[in-house]
A protein has these predicted regions:
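Hydrophobic alpha-helical positions that pack around
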Residues: 82, 133-251, 262-264
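Cofactor-/ligand-binding subdomain signature composed of acidic, glycine-rich
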Residues: 2-48
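Histidine-anchored nucleotide/phosphate-binding helix
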Residues: 107-121
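Gly-rich Lys/Arg/Thr-decorated short loops/hinges at beta-loop-alpha junctions or inter-strand turns
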Residues: 29-33, 88-100, 192, 236-241
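Ferredoxin-type iron-sulfur electron-transfer modules in oxidoreductases and energy-metabolism complexes
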Residues: 37-50, 82-84, 90, 100-104, ...
């Protein structure tokens, strides 16, 4: 799916957030009111009872109870005698996620309804909606705001489109005109957020779910879903899916039903929860239910509802290595363990994939960054890398021989930017090689000497960060036996 296109949408079961999509495509205000009906304001106690009764948890990945956030802001406003600000986090910095873009482009009024409910209950001064610059959905959101009257002034703020854009503290910093990175120390936005005021900050889908429940009431809302996770879930299914889509399904539904809907073929593993998520095996996927509890039971995580299955023709560790390199580059660069440790972790994963280092090097590098940053970025990256080497242990064994797994890296993880358009691999003219061994000294991370003193290296493409060293090794070969060739 291109990042400039409106994603396809599918539904398993009763549509709620996606109701009316089939009939109207995008719901303008008239269509929105026809499909969802009217909605009235709520006093603080009413909104708290609703949020608690529906057991609403944040849909941005962390799953923090919305009622606790709301109560914290109410108490902070009273304690400090300050007005509140409501912030909608629609930045969706995770490249593999599309659910917020769907809501922005197809159902913007649901998001605005939820934000308006919160603003009225808090007697807020303003609503701020954070979106990524150049993001799909901004125009739709602006059109929706022009169609209606909000209870308080409402503005849209664009922030840099980066992975860490969705971190709450980074968004507040960006809105306040500061560098759009997480604060160096933990801060509670409920005490001091936008303009130093108590701030209610939650994800776009969270506000949309609140708007749905306000019309249904907590009991009817809970008619779908599980006892501890009522309602529906928005998922983004990509990867090997023949029909990639954003899917709305009932919480607790078998994962297999969602995979079948998106025509997912046989897989080696499935990434659950996105780039800060975890991989699960095909066997685990057959038993999994789509809920936080259900996925945790099989070793996965729901996160922001991202599902990336990998087909059997794809090198899973090569795909994972690309993601870890991307995440290392997305560091805010303000915390030493993250700034220095994540590139080390990416290097360790690359070396393990190349067969140059054992998996213990990855585990050690991950251990150096876990719990050592101002935000959860290093922890999430470490979790992703460790999960990959655990679930794809057999592939790792094949890579450890230096011969690789025999499958290609296809770039199916949804990473932004163009893939490597000129992948290159090393080749050797055995009739020329005299075993001088200079090449192994130039780029020891990729070339080693076998028992007879001749060079040995993986048949896989040379990692981009080793490309310069490989080229130097080619140049110093006295017999002109070593060459760089296009990798097919």
């Amino acid at each position: 799916m291109m990042r400039t296109a409106v994603p396809p949408v599918a539904c398993v079961g009763e549509p709620r957030l996606t109701a009316g999509f089939a009939e109207f495509g995008r719901l303008d205000l008239a269509a929105h009111e026809e499909v969802h009906g009217p909605i009235g304001p709520m006093e603080p106690a009413q909104l708290l009872r609703l949020a608690e009764g529906m057991q609403l948890k944040g849909k941005g990945g962390a799953g923090f109870p919305f009622a606790r956030k709301l109560r914290a802001v109410l108490e902070s406003c009273e304690r400090q005698d300050l007005a509140a600000v409501v912030v909608v986090n629609a930045t969706e910095g995770e490249p593999a996620s599309w659910k917020d873009k769907v809501l922005l482009t197809r159902a913007p009024h649901l998001i605005l309804d939820g934000a308006a409910l919160a603003a009225y209950a808090l007697d807020a001064d303003e609503i701020v909606i954070g979106v990524a610059d150049g993001m799909v959905g901004r125009d739709s959101l602006m059109e929706a705001l022009e169609e209606r009257r909000m209870p308080v002034p409402t503005t849209i703020v664009s922030v840099p489109h980066r992975f860490i854009s969705g971190e709450g503290g980074a968004l507040v910093n960006g809105i306040n005109g500061l560098p759009h990175i997480p604060p160096g120390t933990k801060k509670r936005s409920s005490d001091s957020g936008v303009s130093g005021l108590p701030t209610l900050l939650s994800n776009a889908e969270t506000y949309a779910q609140l708007a749905v429940a306000a019309r249904l009431g907590p009991y009817e809302y809970a008619a779908l879903g599980t006892d501890d996770e009522p309602g529906t879930v928005l998922l983004t299914v990509t990867g090997a899916a023949a029909r990639p889509a954003v899917v709305e399904c009932t919480a607790g539904m078998p994962l297999r039903d969602v995979l079948d809907l998106c025509e997912v073929p046989d897989v080696q593993g499935i990434l659950m929860g996105g780039y800060h998520g975890k991989w699960i095996t095909p066997e685990a996927a057959e038993k999994a239910e789509v809920s936080r509890k259900g996925l945790a039971a099989v070793g996965g995580t729901l996160g922001a509802g991202i599902i990336v299955p990998l087909g059997v023709d794809t090198c899973p560790l090569g795909e994972a290595a690309q993601v870890v390199r991307y995440l290392a580059g997305e560091s805010a660069g303000q915390c030493g363990p993250c700034k220095m440790g994540l590139p080390d972790l990416a290097r360790a994963v690359d070396l393990a994939v190349a067969g140059s280092q054992p998996a213990d090097v990855v585990r050690a590098a991950a251990g150096e960054v876990k719990g050592r940053g101002a935000c959860s970025h290093p922890d999430g990256t470490a979790r992703f890398a460790l999960s990959a080497i655990e679930v794809f242990a057999e592939d790792l064994r094949l890579h450890s021989t230096g011969d690789g797994c025999g499958r290609r890296v296809r770039g199916v993880m949804g990473l932004p930017g163009a893939p490597d358009v000129n992948p290159q691999k090393l080749t050797l003219d055995w009739s020329r090689c005299d075993g001088h061994g200079l090449c192994a000294h130039v780029v020891p991370d990729f070339i080693r000497l076998d028992a007879n003193g001749y060079p040995a290296f993986p048949p896989t493409p040379v990692p981009t960060w080793l490309r310069e060293g490989a080229l130097k090794a080619v140049k110093v070969c006295p017999e002109l036996a070593l060459r760089l060739a296009k990798a097919e």
